[in-house]
């Protein structure tokens, strides 16, 4: 459900940058012959030519759509170039596109807080950069940057095509603008500067939305594509939302949006204005009702998270129609490949970024034989993540078996799996320093052995309530050794101070792991996938913690400084 967050008192400048048919651009950079040609990137699948996942604007002009498959696209546009995504382990390998996206992120992050939302889209909080520009007299911005900013689409600014740039320049330069609009104008110039840099340094074009919050910036970033940007002044918000279809709003594309249409007769966001906050709360609960009331007014307090790295790693594969998996052997074969890729990615994250993932989750889509219309879904299953390809493969299969047993409800019937995915989540940074890492892994000493999570137990982390933790694979590895029992007995004495207990604990771990010296040794220790690592983290509760502008700009726009 959506969360109603309070909006900051100070005005913000938020941008949503969206790459233009990014996969196609990456392939065009690899093979410049494709530039200007109708091109589409197809997913790994030879059925009917494969599914289209990106379509160039040249191909769209012929009527090619992403919902088509390769064979249909060729019928619509015989001259289309179909480029297949790279393949690894029998499935699409997106590392080429992830790497290209990282090039773009490195540039965009130079101007403020940057949140990487996906391979090809980013949120930016440019508030500080806009304020700094507003205080400059004159600011340092070349004419070509201002020219790019002057091409912006300003919502609510009426002008014919011939007068557009002139009117946008006037809007950017106007001396009577309020503080919020002046910040937005600076944001438009900063985004234009970043987009020019991205094009020069990567050969990629991108579009952007600039507004006072993430919700509005996201909504308008795709309004004028390709290679354009759109600005939403506060004075234009209501008119913009008045005609926006409910299903176009994030969080309203599913059941909640359908409920608004069916129960309240709401078809556009503007229609929500006729309902009081109390009425919406009565219908949908306090939190959701408040969120709907604020959304109708363009209010959103969601902040840009300063995150350049993904919050999770996932690998998946679909098996449509006759490709569905119908026995455990075929499921295991594909799970092993998915887990191998996942293991490589989390190991790379560990080595390069010093981050550890805590939770392994398995998702699947399934159907029972002769029950094609069944509404029961295959349950997602989670367990503490153990590093090492073999361990991940073993645990993932156990998760699948647990989910299948629950899905079938003890019925002796056939089944089909049409989608499989494994995800590593709950990622945290490793604290610097060997002793800190040891403390973080082990936590405070306990006289009791680690508890064994059962499939019926409720996860301690509220965000994992929809998942079920299954019993660890090797229960015997959870039992304390003789030396551990002795230490636990010793530590139970109340006369030992907390400081002394911590010293004894680190000494005990050091004896057990004499090779651990510095962070690199710890990384090696973790990569070996010691069973005590994930079990002790779970038992200790660690799973849930954790440049000049044109003269008019200089004279008029910056004539009155703001503090």
Could you describe each region identified by the protein language model?
Residues 1-563:
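Basic, low-complexity intrinsically disordered segments
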């Amino acid at each position: 459900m959506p969360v109603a967050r309070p909006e900051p008192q100070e005005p913000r400048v938020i941008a949503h940058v969206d790459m233009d048919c990014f996969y196609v651009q990456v392939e065009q950079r690899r093979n410049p012959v494709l530039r200007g040609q109708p091109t589409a990137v197809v997913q790994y699948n030879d059925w009917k030519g494969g599914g289209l996942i990106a379509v160039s604007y040249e191909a769209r002009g012929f009527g090619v759509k992403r919902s088509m498959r390769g064979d249909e696209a060729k019928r619509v546009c015989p001259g289309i170039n179909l480029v297949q995504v790279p393949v690894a382990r029998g499935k699409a390998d997106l590392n080429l596109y992830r790497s290209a996206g990282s090039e773009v992120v490195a540039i965009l992050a130079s101007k403020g807080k940057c949140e990487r939302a996906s391979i090809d889209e980013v949120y930016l909080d440019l508030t500080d950069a806009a304020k700094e520009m507003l205080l400059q007299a004159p600011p340092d911005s070349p004419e070509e940057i201002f020219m790019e900013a002057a091409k912006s689409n300003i919502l609510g600014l009426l002008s014919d095509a011939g007068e557009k740039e002139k009117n946008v320049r006037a809007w950017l330069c106007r001396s009577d603008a309020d503080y919020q609009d002046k910040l937005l104008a600076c944001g438009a110039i900063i985004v234009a500067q970043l987009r020019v840099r991205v094009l020069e340094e990567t050969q990629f074009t991108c579009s952007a939305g600039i507004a006072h919050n993430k919700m509005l910036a996201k909504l308008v970033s795709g309004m004028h594509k390709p290679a354009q940007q759109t600005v939403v002044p506060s004075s234009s918000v209501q008119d913009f939302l008045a005609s926006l279809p409910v299903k176009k709003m994030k969080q309203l594309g599913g059941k909640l949006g359908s409920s608004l249409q069916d129960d309240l007769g709401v078809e556009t966001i503007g229609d929500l204005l006729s309902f009081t906050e109390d009425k919406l709360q009565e219908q949908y609960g306090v939190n959701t009702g408040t969120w709907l009331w604020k959304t109708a007014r363009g209010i959103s307090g969601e902040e840009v998270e300063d995150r350049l790295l993904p919050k999770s790693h996932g690998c998946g594969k679909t098996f449509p129609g006759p490709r569905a998996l119908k026995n455990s052997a075929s499921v295991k074969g594909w799970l092993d490949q998915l887990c191998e890729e996942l293991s490589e990615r989390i190991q790379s994250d560990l080595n390069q970024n010093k981050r550890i993932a805590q939770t392994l989750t398995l998702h699947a889509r399934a159907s029972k034989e002769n029950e094609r219309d069944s509404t029961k879904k295959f349950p997602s299953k989670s367990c503490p993540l153990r590093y090492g390809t073999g361990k991940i493969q073993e645990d993932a299969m156990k998760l699948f078996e647990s989910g299948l047993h629950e899905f079938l409800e003890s019925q002796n019937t056939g089944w089909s799996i049409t989608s499989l995915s494994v995800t590593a989540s709950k990622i945290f940074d490793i604290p610097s320093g060997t002793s800190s890492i040891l403390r973080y892994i082990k936590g405070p000493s306990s006289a009791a052995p680690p508890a064994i999570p059962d499939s019926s137990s409720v996860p301690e982390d509220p965000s994992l309530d929809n998942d079920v933790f299954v019993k660890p694979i090797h229960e015997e590895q959870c039992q304390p050794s003789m030396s551990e029992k002795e230490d636990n007995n010793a530590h139970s004495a109340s006369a030992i101070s907390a400081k002394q207990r911590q010293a004894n604990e680190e000494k005990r771990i050091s004896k057990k792991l004499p090779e651990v010296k510095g962070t690199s040794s710890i990384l090696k220790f973790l990569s070996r996938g010691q069973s005590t690592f994930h079990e002790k983290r779970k038992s200790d509760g660690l799973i849930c913690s954790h440049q000049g502008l044109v003269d008019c700009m200089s004279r008029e726009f910056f004539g009155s400084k703001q503090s």
